[in-house]
């Protein structure tokens, strides 16, 4: 059971990760958004439903095995592969392929996000994450689903802020979408 007070930002990223971990072990996530309601009746109902489902499911999950899959890291053997990056801004994105070419990388910007990006992002990510994260996931999935990029010979690059920005959590969303897609 996860309690959340808002369901956006870090909560949304954590919810997606917890849900995946639990699903890999044959369990379900019960999410209680404590700011969603003034009446606690629905929260009590969810808790009672959780308790009942735990009773009936206890025997089923004893022999459950996890099928954890990971994406390979980019190494020297991948040199020369196409690397796609989401469109960041009209000021920075045009510079990325040229700068990365100087470092020996074959980088291509994805086009700016559109309505289809949003649709793909909603399909492959937690729909409570921030809108920019939905678009980034959608841009990447749209690119691969278009057939223009071979998943066996194309890599995805994404920035990591290492700080408090939610962009630090995009990697886990992208990874999950690629594995599910």
Which ranges hold each PLM region?
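An N-terminal assembly and electron-transfer interface module characteristic of large anaerobic redox
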Residues: 2-181
